Amino acid sequence: MKVLALRHSVAQVYADTQTYVHDDSKDEYENAFLISNLTTHNILYINYSVKTLKILNKSGIAAVEIQSPDELFALIRCNFTYDYENNTVYLHDYSYYTNNEIRTDQHWVTKTDIIDYLLPGWKLTYVGYNGKDTRGHYNFSFTCQNAATDDDIIIEYIYSSELDFQTFLLRKIKERMTTSLPIARLSNRVFRDKLFPSIVNIHKRVVNVGPRNESMFTFLNFPTIKQFSNGAYLVKHTIKLKQERWLGKRVSQFDIGQYKNMLNVVTTIYYYYNLHSSKPVIYMLGSAPSYWIYDIRQYSDFTFETWDPLDTPYSTTHHKELFFDKDVTKLKDNSILYIDIRTDRGNMDWKEWRKVVEQQTVSNLSIAYKYLSTGKAKVCCVKLTAMDLELPITAKLLHHPTTEIRSEFYAILDVWDISTIKRFVPKGVFYAFINNVTTENVFIQPPFKLRTLPNDYIVALYALSNDFNPRQDIINLINKQKQSLITVRINNTFKDEPKVNFKNIYDWTFLPTDFEIKDSIITSYDGCLGIFGLSTSLSSKPTGNNHLFIINGTDKYYKLDQYANHMGISRRSHQVRFSESATSYSGYIFRDLSNNNFNLIGTNIENSVSGHVYNALIYYRYNYAFDLKRWIYLHSIGEVTVEGGKYYEHAPIELIYACRSAKEFAALQDDLTVLRYANEIEGYINKVYSITYADDPNYFIGVRFDSIPYEYDVKVPHLTFGVLFISDNMIHDVITVLKKMKTELFKMEVSTSYTYMLSDGIHVANASGVLSTYFKLYNMFYRNHITFGQSRMFIPHITLSFSNKRTVRIENTRLKINSIYLRKIKGETVFDMSE
């Protein structure tokens, strides 16, 4: 949902839009809670409170102040990610298609011939990093840019087996127009750009697990972050390959040589980072034109020194000349060297050309070895060709996508490689490598071992759920790692499936109850965004590839009503109740009936089941931004601090009742996952609370009334206001609690309206208006370690007769309390008090 805050209402009517006027009789938190549970996607918030907007944003719900009709139109028609700390809106708006336009934020693309393969009459527009160059389109009171681009389509095409780009592009645009927006993927770059600076500022040692190409620019500013990926393809791995011949296969209709060179250099940079944790100077031989340097420098400041007889326009220092073996002495330490020297073929015969290429390969290797043989902190990426060669067995082979699969590939060498054993590799084996292996990631660091790192902050986004990681090892890491942000795939199946298919692999699935962690927050993507200064207009879908975000060691843990809170907890319930259910009271009715409470009079006001816990369980797929386990735990230890809102402290037994209702709901829906989740949450409640039951009671609290509007034959008709199991020396403690509660007890507005048979031979009258006070009393006894209440639900009633009688119905009648007393069962009254 998105909340657009206005000072006055608008005449225009928008689809899927609801108006909410700030209620001055309620505080900012209560207004935020009410807004968050509205069911439309767009909320026009009139006469808004700035603090209410802040509360919503910290909860991950995008809430933006609107100052003009243009701002309203821009935000109501698309989804966006909001940096609420810097008041910047990142639109995810593809309406530019109506300009016959596709967009890119990678400059190198604009220097290719891609325009020849677009849809007829279409153009390509460069919009800068995250759409920064579009800021001039929006003259708004907040900073606004459109981060939507088609780079995902371009990159997917490059790695696909398809050659016809126009057909591919058309299909992908049609898919985009007919499927829901993948908001997590679109906002992820914005999220990473907020996340890592904040983590690095606090933690000296940061580990990042499983980065992919979409993160390749993000980490250029963070050389100290230790990366873990899937490892490199080494020369020694070629021993498994059978020899092949030249393939000569076209990969892309438009020239992607620039992209290949950029990937080679970025791969080398990250390889250097993992060795030396600092930024290198970048030397490049055969550099022209290297338009992609512009892209890298948009993200991070690097020094490029280049050699080529042709221009390299974005280089820091360019030498318009050839580079020779003798020039290696010009290259300094703390650097990387990219050797991409290759003479143009021109009209040369292919055999003659082949000789030249092989000579250049030998020359390139000679320069690489000479560069690495002296000095320190050096890494080289060198262009090679398929030929009979000796290479160090630990050299890293690269084959990033290029326009045609021919004879070229690249190798990364460091100062240790040149002193290791070399292996002879025949030309046919290199062709087998070129023909069959595509380097899919610029991060070629070793895989992460699932073990705790006590001194490090671990970030693992979408990286650990794969089933090649033992499931229990994943759980152990999350349970034991003190500081981390780790995601695992949520179990949103209905058959409680332990693993699910994802692309060509399987992922383990998890529920919050799989983990035993303290001082940690378990939430959704949008809940996590709120913790790091962002919010989003579109929540994750209830099904599909969604993840739990588990934040260990956060200082936000005790801020229960600010982050990963209960905002939106009833939204799905409202959607169902007011659209498709038998009555809008269906949830209240079911919760009472499933706990054998058949008095449904006032069920929406007076009920014994925690609606928060019930909704958090049965609709967890919709509202898992709410950290239920944290909420339960902080209540159990009495560490709940709230800034505002309508706060009600549940008695622990109310939470148990909610679990029982949720289990029955799950059984009726054949939802095995909710069934297990509710069982495990009930177990967790029993673990963190010390709940005892007076199922064999020896005392009871009675309430006498001035008069009863029914016939009765018991000596003194009374309301049994709970039973206790206590020793005689605890009587004083019970009386102390009753005295503290005296005012509230006598303020109860008790009423009755019918009689019924509680069981065979027990005729009783219903009693309404007492449950909220009963649970307050329960909590007082619980905190004083006094066993009060039974395991079955408390059903307030007044015993009239121990014989079978017919039901009597009367007008709802108020009962005046005469006295409240404590009496031993089958014994004497030990305490009595009157108003």
From Swiss-Prot:
Reactions that this protein is recorded to catalyse: a 5'-end diphospho-ribonucleoside in mRNA + GTP + H(+) = a 5'-end (5'-triphosphoguanosine)-ribonucleoside in mRNA + diphosphate; a 5'-end (5'-triphosphoguanosine)-ribonucleoside in mRNA + S-adenosyl-L-methionine = a 5'-end (N(7)-methyl 5'-triphosphoguanosine)-ribonucleoside in mRNA + S-adenosyl-L-homocysteine; 5'-triphosphoadenylyl-(2'->5')-adenylyl-(2'->5')-adenosine + 2 H2O = 2 AMP + ATP + 2 H(+)
Predominant cellular place of this UniProt entry's protein: virion
Swiss-Prot/TrEMBL keywords: GTP-binding, Host-virus interaction, Hydrolase, Inhibition of host innate immune response by virus, Methyltransferase, mRNA capping, mRNA processing, Multifunctional enzyme, Nucleotide-binding, Nucleotidyltransferase, RNA-binding, S-adenosyl-L-methionine, Transferase, Viral immunoevasion, Virion
Record carries keyword GTP-binding: yes
GO molecular function: GTP binding; hydrolase activity; mRNA 5'-cap (guanine-N7-)-methyltransferase activity; mRNA guanylyltransferase activity; RNA binding
GO cellular component, as recorded: viral nucleocapsid
N7-methyltransferase activity as annotated region, ranges: 171-245, 429-555
Pfam family, one: Rotavirus_VP3
Enzyme Commission identifier(s): 3.1.4.-, 2.7.7.50, 2.1.1.56
Signal peptide: none
Region of interest (GTase/RTPase activity), residue spans: 556-692
Coiled-coil stretches noted in the UniProt entry, renumbered to this chain: none
Function: Multifunctional enzyme involved in mRNA capping. Catalyzes the formation of the 5' cap structure on the viral plus-strand transcripts. Specifically binds to GTP and displays guanylyltransferase and methyltransferase activities. Has affinity for ssRNA but not for dsRNA. Capping activity is non-specific and caps RNAs that initiate with either a G or an A residue. Together with VP1 polymerase, forms a VP1-VP3 complex positioned near the channels situated at each of the five-fold vertices of the core.
Domain-related comment: Contains a bipartite N7-methyltransferase domain, a 2'-O-methyltransferase domain and a GTase/RTPase domain. The C-terminus contains a phosphodiesterase domain that degrades the 5'-triphosphorylated, 2'-5' linked adenylate oligomers produced by the host cell in response to IFN stimulation.
Binding partners and assembly: Interacts with VP1. Interacts with VP2.
This protein's name: Protein VP3
